[in-house]
Amino acid sequence: MNGKVKWFNNEKGFGFIEMEGSEDVFVHFSAIQSDGYKALEEGQEVSFDITEGNRGPQAANVAKL
């Protein structure tokens, strides 16, 4: 799936991804597929999978586009 980062708090290490016609999806820094510091920028395009977490759907295998 593809979406845009709605917001991401670098200090806390989480945020949300928005998709057209769907609810926002929680994203944790541990789901970001990159080397080094794992963070996302507001408005950044990403691809991801959705898994079922403890508190509902969350992003997995997040890659910056």
UniProtKB/Swiss-Prot annotation:
InterPro entries: Cold_shock_CspA, Cold_shock_domain, CSD, CSD_CS, CSP_DNA-bd, NA-bd_OB-fold. PROSITE patterns: CSD_1, CSD_2. It is found in: Cytoplasm. Signal peptide: none annotated. Keywords: Activator, Cytoplasm, DNA-binding, Transcription, Transcription regulation. Its main location: cytoplasm. One of its GO terms (cellular component) is cytoplasm. Residues 3-62 form the CSD domain. Homodimer. PANTHER family: COLD SHOCK DOMAIN CONTAINING PROTEINS. This is Cold shock-like protein CspB. It comes from Bacillus cereus.
